Amino acid sequence: MNSILAIKNIIIESLSQAMEKARQEGQIPALSVDISIEHPQKTNYGDYATSLPLRLAKATGKRPMELAQILASYIETGSGISKVSVAPPGFINFTFSKEWLCSLVKTILTEAGSYGNINMGGGSRVQIEFVSANPTGPIHIGHGRGAVLGSTLSNILKAAGYYVEEEFYINDAGSQIDAFKRTLFARYQQALGKDAAVPQDGYHGQYMVDLAAEMVTKYGDKYLQMPADIAQNDLGEIGMARMLCLISDDLKALKVDFDIWFSERSLYSGGQYKTAMDILSGNNYIAERDNATWFSSTLLGDSKDNVIVRSDGTPTYFASDIAYHYNKFIERKFDRVINIWGADHQGHVSRMKAMVSALGINPERLTTLLFQMITLKRGGELVRLSKRTGEIISLREVIEEVGADACRFFFLARSTESQMDFDLELAKKESAENPVYYVQYAHARICSILHLAAEKQLDYSTGDTDLLGEEAELELIRKMAELPEIVETVSRTLEPHHLTYYAQELANAFHQFYKDCRVISDNAELTCARLKLVDASRIVLARTLHLMGMTSPESM
C-alpha cells in the first residue's frame, strides 16, 4: 500500500463508509453523491481534503461544520493517514503519516525507472495520430507543438498501462500533391536553364528552389529526356519522399518518432475507402444530389451534410477521413483513437463524431484534441520571419537555436486550448527565470551530490529513512509521492501541461531541501538517510523529464 493512488482510494472509501454509518445512526438521510478529494492549496490543512460536507448541507439540513464533525468521527486513522481533522467552512482534511512518507523513499528506490507507472489502461489499445503535415514543405512551430503534445501523451498513456501506437498520416492523395509536383518540375527546369513558370497555386518558398537544385545534382537533366507528364510525376514522387525524410529528421531532432507512417493513398488502393462507403450506404447515410455524393451527417445531429465525392468525381478530404477511421477502428481494432489537430480544425470535430457513429462505432471512442498556435518572440518582440530565409521560421531553426528540451518544455507549458508565447531569449537563459534550466539544474545538482558521495565512498544502501523528519525533507517526499497521481490525471484529462507544473514544483521542493538540510555531514546515519532521499529525488525527477521527452543532465 505504498502508492498515493491506493491511499486516495482508501480515503474515498472511508468517506463512503462514514456516510453509511451516519445514515445508520439517523444523522443523515440516504444520499447518493460522488465523493472527491483534492490537495489543499496550503499544506498546513493536510495532504488531502474534501468539501463533501459543504455539498451535503442542503440535502441534510445541517450546517457544513456539523456534518464535517459527524463524518470525521467515523473515520479512523491508519493506512498511511496519521490525522483526520475538520476546518471551516466545512472541510475534512487528511494528513499522511511520517512513517508512510519515509517508507515511500524505499519504494521509489526499489521501483526505480518504473516508479509512477499505473495500471489504468489494462493493455487497452490506443492510437494517437498527430502532426500529419502535408509532405509539401518544412514543418513549423505549430506542427512542433502538436508533435510534443502527441509524443508526451503517448509516454504518459504507456506509463498508465495502455498499449499505444503513434502515427503520422501522410496526406499524399490530394490536390496539394499535384501542386507540389508541378512546382518542383518547374523549379527543376529553371535550375537547368529552361523557361518554366511556377504555377499560381504552387509552392513559392525558397525550399522548393533548394529541393530542385538537389534533384539536379543527383539526377542531372534525366527528367528533361522523357515526356513531361511522366517526368513531373516521377520527379514529384522523389521530391515528396525527400520532403518526408526532412520532416522526419526535424521531428527526430525534437525527439519525436512514429511507429507508423500511414499513406492516404493506401486507403484507396487497398479498397478500404470503398468498404467504408458501402457501410455508410448500407446504413442509409449516403445521398446523391447536385451531381455529388453527400454524407447525411444531419441525421446524426450535425449542423449540415458534408460532400464526400465532388461533382467531378474526386473524393474530398472528408472521404479520406471516413476511410481512415474505418481503418483505425474496424481494420486495426483500436479501442480508442486520439487525433491531435490544430485549432483551425474546430469545425471538423462534430462531423467526425457523426461519421464514426454512422460506421457503427461508439463515438466516445474517438477523441479530438485541438491545440492553439504559438506566438514566437525574442525578448518580448514578435518574431515573424526567419532571418535566414526571410520566410516563416521553421521548426528546425527554433530547435537549433534553443534546443529540443526547451522546445518540448515550452510547447507543453500551457493547456492545449491556450495560445502561448514562446520567448526564444528566455528559453536560452541559464537562470531560475528559465523553467527548463531550473528543472534540469535540480537534476544536475542531485547528481553532483551523489558523485561527491561516491568520491567519499559513502555506502548509503543501508540508510534508515525513518530518520528523515525535517519539514523540507517531508515536503520533498510529499511532492515525489504525487507522480503516479499526475500520470493518472494526465491520462484521464489528456492535458500534459500538468507535467510541466509538477516538474517545477518538484525541482523547487528539492532546491528548498538542499537549502535547509545539509546532505553530507558528520552525522553518518543521517547522511545515509538523506542520500537515499536524494537518490529517490533523482529517480522521480528523471522520470518526470523522461515522460516529457526531455534529457536529465548530470552536469550543467
From Swiss-Prot:
UniProt EC number: 6.1.1.19
Superkingdom of the organism of origin: Bacteria
UniProt xrefs under PROSITE patterns: AA_TRNA_LIGASE_I
Top-level EC class: ligase
GO molecular function, one term: arginine-tRNA ligase activity
Gene3D superfamilies per UniProt: Arginyl tRNA synthetase N-terminal domain, HUPs, Isoleucyl-tRNA Synthetase, Domain 1
SMART domains: Arg_tRNA_synt_N, DALR_1
GO biological process: arginyl-tRNA aminoacylation
Keyword Protein biosynthesis: yes
Keywords carried by this UniProt record: Aminoacyl-tRNA synthetase, ATP-binding, Cytoplasm, Ligase, Nucleotide-binding, Protein biosynthesis
Location within or outside the cell: Cytoplasm
Cellular component aspect of the GO annotation: cytoplasm
Catalytic reaction(s) noted: tRNA(Arg) + L-arginine + ATP = L-arginyl-tRNA(Arg) + AMP + diphosphate
Annotated motif 'HIGH' region, positions: 133-143
SUPFAM superfamilies for the chain: Anticodon-binding domain of a subclass of class I aminoacyl-tRNA synthetases, Arginyl-tRNA synthetase (ArgRS), N-terminal 'additional' domain, Nucleotidylyl transferase
CDD domains referenced in this protein's UniProt entry, alphabetically: ArgRS_core (cd00671)
InterPro entries for this protein: aa-tRNA-synth_I_CS, Arg-tRNA-ligase, Arg-tRNA-synth_N, Arg-tRNA-synth_N_sf, ArgRS_core, DALR_anticod-bd, Rossmann-like_a/b/a_fold, tRNAsynth_Ia_anticodon-bd
Homology family: Belongs to the class-I aminoacyl-tRNA synthetase family.
Subunit: Monomer.
Protein name (record): Arginine--tRNA ligase
Origin species: Dehalococcoides mccartyi (strain CBDB1)
